[in-house]
Amino acid sequence: MSNPQFRAGFVAIVGRPNVGKSTLTNALIGTKISIVSRKAQTTRHRIHGVLTREHEQFVFVDTPGFQTRHGGAMNRMMNRVVTQALADVDVVVHVVEAGKWSEGDAKLLPLLPKSRRSILVVSKIDALKNRDELFPFVSKLMALHAYDAVVPVSATKGQQLDQLLDEIAAGLPQGDPMFEEDTLTDRPVRFIAAELVREKIFRLVGDELPYGCTVVIEQWEETERGVRIAACVVVERESHRPILLGAGGMHMKRIATEARQDIAKLLDMPVHLEIYIKVRKGWSDREGALRDLGYE
Protein backbone atom coordinates (compact mmCIF):
# COMPACT_ATOMS: atom_id res chain seq x y z
CA MET A 1 0.00 0.00 0.00
CA SER A 2 1.25 3.45 -0.83
CA ASN A 3 2.44 5.74 1.95
CA PRO A 4 0.85 9.16 1.28
CA GLN A 5 3.60 10.86 3.31
CA PHE A 6 6.49 9.31 1.38
CA ARG A 7 8.36 11.43 -1.17
CA ALA A 8 10.57 10.21 -4.00
CA GLY A 9 12.15 11.93 -6.97
CA PHE A 10 15.14 12.74 -9.13
CA VAL A 11 17.74 15.34 -8.16
CA ALA A 12 20.21 16.74 -10.72
CA ILE A 13 23.59 17.80 -9.38
CA VAL A 14 25.03 20.23 -11.92
CA GLY A 15 27.88 22.70 -12.18
CA ARG A 16 31.00 23.54 -14.13
CA PRO A 17 33.92 21.08 -14.08
CA ASN A 18 35.80 20.48 -10.83
CA VAL A 19 33.43 22.17 -8.38
CA GLY A 20 32.95 18.98 -6.35
CA LYS A 21 29.78 17.44 -7.81
CA SER A 22 30.93 13.83 -7.60
CA THR A 23 32.43 14.30 -4.14
CA LEU A 24 29.10 15.73 -3.00
CA THR A 25 27.13 12.87 -4.58
CA ASN A 26 29.32 10.27 -2.89
CA ALA A 27 29.06 12.05 0.47
CA LEU A 28 25.26 12.30 0.32
CA ILE A 29 24.86 8.62 -0.55
CA GLY A 30 27.53 7.50 1.89
CA THR A 31 29.49 5.41 -0.59
CA LYS A 32 31.58 5.86 -3.72
CA ILE A 33 29.58 5.58 -6.93
CA SER A 34 31.12 8.53 -8.83
CA ILE A 35 34.86 8.72 -9.44
CA VAL A 36 36.87 11.74 -8.38
CA SER A 37 40.16 13.27 -9.51
CA ARG A 38 41.78 16.67 -9.86
CA LYS A 39 41.32 16.42 -13.63
CA ALA A 40 38.33 18.34 -14.95
CA GLN A 41 35.63 16.33 -16.74
CA THR A 42 36.39 13.14 -14.78
CA THR A 43 32.67 12.36 -14.78
CA ARG A 44 31.48 11.63 -18.33
CA HIS A 45 28.23 9.74 -17.80
CA ARG A 46 24.97 10.46 -16.07
CA ILE A 47 25.19 8.41 -12.89
CA HIS A 48 22.25 7.70 -10.61
CA GLY A 49 22.96 7.34 -6.90
CA VAL A 50 20.17 6.38 -4.52
CA LEU A 51 19.64 7.37 -0.88
CA THR A 52 16.59 6.18 1.04
CA ARG A 53 15.53 7.72 4.36
CA GLU A 54 12.47 7.00 6.47
CA HIS A 55 10.20 9.36 4.56
CA GLU A 56 12.10 10.06 1.32
CA GLN A 57 14.01 8.45 -1.50
CA PHE A 58 16.50 10.66 -3.36
CA VAL A 59 17.72 9.57 -6.80
CA PHE A 60 20.76 11.76 -7.43
CA VAL A 61 21.88 12.36 -11.01
CA ASP A 62 25.60 13.17 -10.97
CA THR A 63 26.34 14.89 -14.27
CA PRO A 64 29.52 15.84 -16.17
CA GLY A 65 30.78 19.38 -15.77
CA PHE A 66 29.09 21.66 -18.29
CA GLN A 67 31.66 22.42 -20.99
CA THR A 68 31.79 25.93 -22.43
CA ARG A 69 35.28 26.21 -23.92
CA HIS A 70 35.97 23.14 -26.01
CA GLY A 71 34.03 21.45 -28.79
CA GLY A 72 34.32 17.88 -29.98
CA ALA A 73 31.94 14.95 -29.95
CA MET A 74 32.65 13.96 -26.35
CA ASN A 75 32.05 17.44 -24.97
CA ARG A 76 28.85 17.77 -26.99
CA MET A 77 27.74 14.43 -25.61
CA MET A 78 28.49 15.46 -22.03
CA ASN A 79 26.58 18.72 -22.43
CA ARG A 80 23.59 16.74 -23.76
CA VAL A 81 23.73 14.63 -20.61
CA VAL A 82 23.54 17.79 -18.48
CA THR A 83 20.65 19.41 -20.39
CA GLN A 84 18.69 16.15 -20.46
CA ALA A 85 19.16 15.71 -16.72
CA LEU A 86 17.84 19.22 -16.09
CA ALA A 87 14.71 18.43 -18.10
CA ASP A 88 13.98 15.14 -16.34
CA VAL A 89 14.35 15.91 -12.62
CA ASP A 90 12.27 17.25 -9.74
CA VAL A 91 14.99 19.26 -7.96
CA VAL A 92 18.15 20.94 -9.28
CA VAL A 93 21.24 21.37 -7.12
CA HIS A 94 23.62 23.91 -8.67
CA VAL A 95 27.10 23.47 -7.19
CA VAL A 96 29.58 26.35 -7.21
CA GLU A 97 32.95 26.52 -5.50
CA ALA A 98 33.19 28.90 -2.55
CA GLY A 99 34.71 32.22 -3.55
CA LYS A 100 35.03 31.29 -7.22
CA TRP A 101 32.59 32.33 -9.94
CA SER A 102 33.46 31.99 -13.60
CA GLU A 103 32.00 32.16 -17.09
CA GLY A 104 31.33 28.43 -16.86
CA ASP A 105 29.15 28.94 -13.78
CA ALA A 106 27.26 31.81 -15.39
CA LYS A 107 26.48 29.89 -18.59
CA LEU A 108 24.55 27.30 -16.62
CA LEU A 109 22.10 29.83 -15.17
CA PRO A 110 19.82 30.10 -18.24
CA LEU A 111 19.54 26.30 -18.31
CA LEU A 112 18.19 25.99 -14.76
CA PRO A 113 14.45 25.23 -15.11
CA LYS A 114 12.26 27.81 -13.42
CA SER A 115 9.54 25.23 -12.79
CA ARG A 116 11.78 23.09 -10.54
CA ARG A 117 12.99 23.73 -7.02
CA SER A 118 16.58 24.95 -7.37
CA ILE A 119 19.14 24.93 -4.60
CA LEU A 120 22.47 26.74 -4.66
CA VAL A 121 25.19 24.67 -3.01
CA VAL A 122 28.40 26.52 -2.20
CA SER A 123 31.01 23.77 -1.97
CA LYS A 124 34.45 23.52 -0.38
CA ILE A 125 33.67 26.04 2.36
CA ASP A 126 36.42 24.44 4.46
CA ALA A 127 38.95 25.74 1.92
CA LEU A 128 37.91 29.39 2.35
CA LYS A 129 40.72 31.29 4.03
CA ASN A 130 38.37 34.04 5.21
CA ARG A 131 34.84 32.96 6.17
CA ASP A 132 33.75 36.61 6.10
CA GLU A 133 33.88 36.36 2.30
CA LEU A 134 31.09 33.77 2.21
CA PHE A 135 28.08 36.03 2.83
CA PRO A 136 28.87 38.64 0.12
CA PHE A 137 29.69 35.82 -2.31
CA VAL A 138 26.34 34.12 -1.69
CA SER A 139 24.47 37.44 -1.86
CA LYS A 140 25.99 38.12 -5.27
CA LEU A 141 24.83 34.75 -6.61
CA MET A 142 21.34 35.02 -5.15
CA ALA A 143 20.95 38.26 -7.11
CA LEU A 144 21.75 36.42 -10.35
CA HIS A 145 19.14 33.66 -10.03
CA ALA A 146 16.01 33.07 -7.96
CA TYR A 147 17.26 30.04 -6.03
CA ASP A 148 14.77 28.55 -3.59
CA ALA A 149 17.48 27.86 -1.02
CA VAL A 150 21.22 28.15 -0.49
CA VAL A 151 23.33 25.70 1.50
CA PRO A 152 27.10 26.09 2.03
CA VAL A 153 28.71 22.65 2.44
CA SER A 154 31.95 20.78 2.86
CA ALA A 155 31.39 17.35 1.37
CA THR A 156 34.79 16.06 2.46
CA LYS A 157 34.07 16.97 6.10
CA GLY A 158 30.36 16.18 6.04
CA GLN A 159 29.31 19.71 6.95
CA GLN A 160 25.70 20.82 6.27
CA LEU A 161 24.77 17.65 4.35
CA ASP A 162 21.69 16.90 6.46
CA GLN A 163 20.47 20.46 5.95
CA LEU A 164 20.96 20.06 2.20
CA LEU A 165 18.97 16.81 2.18
CA ASP A 166 16.11 18.50 4.02
CA GLU A 167 16.06 21.33 1.48
CA ILE A 168 16.03 18.83 -1.39
CA ALA A 169 13.28 16.76 0.26
CA ALA A 170 11.01 19.82 0.26
CA GLY A 171 10.95 19.68 -3.55
CA LEU A 172 10.37 15.96 -4.01
CA PRO A 173 6.89 14.86 -5.12
CA GLN A 174 4.80 12.47 -3.09
CA GLY A 175 5.13 8.92 -4.36
CA ASP A 176 6.36 5.42 -3.74
CA PRO A 177 10.08 4.58 -3.74
CA MET A 178 11.48 3.74 -7.17
CA PHE A 179 14.25 1.47 -5.89
CA GLU A 180 14.68 -1.08 -3.11
CA GLU A 181 15.79 0.42 0.20
CA ASP A 182 19.33 -0.98 0.01
CA THR A 183 19.96 0.16 -3.60
CA LEU A 184 22.87 2.61 -3.92
CA THR A 185 23.06 3.03 -7.71
CA ASP A 186 21.34 1.84 -10.86
CA ARG A 187 24.68 1.35 -12.60
CA PRO A 188 25.96 -2.24 -12.93
CA VAL A 189 29.09 -3.23 -11.02
CA ARG A 190 30.99 -3.68 -14.29
CA PHE A 191 30.45 0.01 -15.04
CA ILE A 192 31.64 1.06 -11.56
CA ALA A 193 34.69 -1.20 -11.89
CA ALA A 194 35.65 0.41 -15.22
CA GLU A 195 35.20 3.85 -13.69
CA LEU A 196 37.46 2.94 -10.76
CA VAL A 197 40.22 1.96 -13.17
CA ARG A 198 39.77 5.24 -15.04
CA GLU A 199 39.91 7.17 -11.77
CA LYS A 200 43.30 5.66 -10.90
CA ILE A 201 44.60 6.53 -14.37
CA PHE A 202 43.53 10.16 -14.06
CA ARG A 203 44.89 10.46 -10.54
CA LEU A 204 48.30 9.07 -11.46
CA VAL A 205 48.93 10.35 -15.00
CA GLY A 206 46.02 12.74 -15.60
CA ASP A 207 48.32 15.73 -16.02
CA GLU A 208 50.21 13.96 -18.82
CA LEU A 209 47.39 12.06 -20.49
CA PRO A 210 44.81 13.84 -22.67
CA TYR A 211 41.08 13.17 -22.38
CA GLY A 212 41.13 10.53 -25.10
CA CYS A 213 41.29 7.69 -22.59
CA THR A 214 38.49 5.38 -21.49
CA VAL A 215 38.14 1.93 -19.92
CA VAL A 216 36.07 -1.03 -21.11
CA ILE A 217 35.56 -4.24 -19.12
CA GLU A 218 36.04 -7.03 -21.66
CA GLN A 219 35.96 -10.04 -19.34
CA TRP A 220 34.17 -10.65 -16.04
CA GLU A 221 34.29 -14.17 -14.64
CA GLU A 222 33.07 -14.99 -11.14
CA THR A 223 34.51 -18.12 -9.52
CA GLU A 224 34.59 -19.68 -6.06
CA ARG A 225 37.82 -17.77 -5.43
CA GLY A 226 36.50 -14.37 -6.46
CA VAL A 227 36.20 -12.52 -9.75
CA ARG A 228 38.60 -12.32 -12.70
CA ILE A 229 38.40 -9.05 -14.62
CA ALA A 230 40.08 -8.01 -17.86
CA ALA A 231 39.98 -4.26 -18.43
CA CYS A 232 40.96 -2.59 -21.70
CA VAL A 233 42.26 0.99 -21.55
CA VAL A 234 41.45 2.64 -24.89
CA VAL A 235 43.68 5.56 -25.91
CA GLU A 236 43.85 7.65 -29.07
CA ARG A 237 47.56 7.62 -29.86
CA GLU A 238 50.45 5.19 -29.66
CA SER A 239 52.37 7.88 -27.74
CA HIS A 240 49.87 7.51 -24.88
CA ARG A 241 50.95 3.91 -24.25
CA PRO A 242 54.33 4.69 -22.58
CA ILE A 243 52.65 7.36 -20.42
CA LEU A 244 50.27 4.75 -19.05
CA LEU A 245 52.95 2.10 -18.63
CA GLY A 246 55.58 4.27 -16.96
CA ALA A 247 59.20 3.27 -16.49
CA GLY A 248 59.39 -0.50 -16.21
CA GLY A 249 55.61 -0.67 -16.20
CA MET A 250 55.44 0.96 -12.75
CA HIS A 251 52.51 3.25 -13.59
CA MET A 252 50.36 0.40 -14.82
CA LYS A 253 51.26 -1.78 -11.84
CA ARG A 254 50.19 0.95 -9.44
CA ILE A 255 46.97 1.66 -11.39
CA ALA A 256 46.09 -2.04 -11.35
CA THR A 257 46.88 -2.48 -7.66
CA GLU A 258 44.87 0.52 -6.49
CA ALA A 259 41.93 -0.26 -8.78
CA ARG A 260 41.92 -3.91 -7.70
CA GLN A 261 41.78 -2.88 -4.04
CA ASP A 262 38.82 -0.55 -4.63
CA ILE A 263 36.94 -3.10 -6.74
CA ALA A 264 37.51 -5.81 -4.12
CA LYS A 265 36.13 -3.47 -1.47
CA LEU A 266 33.11 -2.71 -3.68
CA LEU A 267 32.38 -6.39 -4.34
CA ASP A 268 33.51 -7.69 -0.94
CA MET A 269 35.41 -10.52 -2.62
CA PRO A 270 38.92 -11.20 -3.96
CA VAL A 271 39.64 -9.69 -7.38
CA HIS A 272 42.18 -10.64 -10.04
CA LEU A 273 42.53 -7.68 -12.39
CA GLU A 274 44.38 -7.60 -15.70
CA ILE A 275 44.72 -4.34 -17.62
CA TYR A 276 45.90 -3.93 -21.18
CA ILE A 277 46.05 -1.00 -23.61
CA LYS A 278 44.46 -0.61 -27.03
CA VAL A 279 44.96 2.30 -29.45
CA ARG A 280 41.84 3.51 -31.27
CA LYS A 281 42.68 6.69 -33.13
CA GLY A 282 40.32 9.65 -32.76
CA TRP A 283 37.63 7.74 -30.85
CA SER A 284 36.67 10.66 -28.57
CA ASP A 285 35.64 12.86 -31.51
CA ARG A 286 33.47 10.31 -33.32
CA GLU A 287 29.84 9.84 -32.29
CA GLY A 288 29.79 6.23 -33.48
CA ALA A 289 32.92 5.32 -31.54
CA LEU A 290 31.53 6.96 -28.41
CA ARG A 291 28.37 4.86 -28.65
CA ASP A 292 30.43 1.70 -29.24
CA LEU A 293 32.35 2.41 -26.04
CA GLY A 294 29.21 2.86 -23.96
CA TYR A 295 28.72 6.62 -23.99
CA GLU A 296 25.20 8.01 -24.13
Swiss-Prot record:
Residues annotated as binding GTP: 15-22, 62-66, 123-126
Membrane topology: Peripheral membrane protein
Entry's Gene Ontology BP terms: ribosomal small subunit assembly
Record region (G5): 153-155
Predominant location: cytoplasm
Protein location: Cytoplasm; Cell inner membrane
Subunit structure: Monomer.
Protein name, as recorded: GTPase Era
Described function: An essential GTPase that binds both GDP and GTP, with rapid nucleotide exchange. Plays a role in 16S rRNA processing and 30S ribosomal subunit biogenesis and possibly also in cell cycle regulation and energy metabolism.
Cited InterPro entries: G_ERA_dom (IPR030388), GTP-bd (IPR006073), GTPase_Era-like (IPR005662), KH_dom-like_a/b (IPR015946), KH_dom_type_2 (IPR004044), KH_sf_prok-type (IPR009019), P-loop_NTPase (IPR027417), Small_GTP-bd (IPR005225)
Any one cellular-component term (Gene Ontology): plasma membrane
Annotated spans, G2: 41-45
Domain KH type-2, chain residue ranges per copy: 205-281
Span of domain Era-type G: 7-174
UniProt entry keywords in alphabetical sequence: Cell inner membrane, Cell membrane, Cytoplasm, GTP-binding, Membrane, Nucleotide-binding, Ribosome biogenesis, RNA-binding, rRNA-binding
Family the entry assigns: Belongs to the TRAFAC class TrmE-Era-EngA-EngB-Septin-like GTPase superfamily. Era GTPase family.
Lineage: Bacteria, Pseudomonadati, Pseudomonadota, Betaproteobacteria, Burkholderiales
Positions of the UniProt region annotated as G1: 15-22
PANTHER family, alphabetized: GTPASE ERA, GTPASE ERA, MITOCHONDRIAL
Organism: Bordetella pertussis (strain Tohama I / ATCC BAA-589 / NCTC 13251)
GO MF annotation: an example: GTP binding
Domain of life: Bacteria
Region (G4): 123-126
Region: G3, residue numbers: 62-65
Entry-linked Pfam families: KH_2, MMR_HSR1
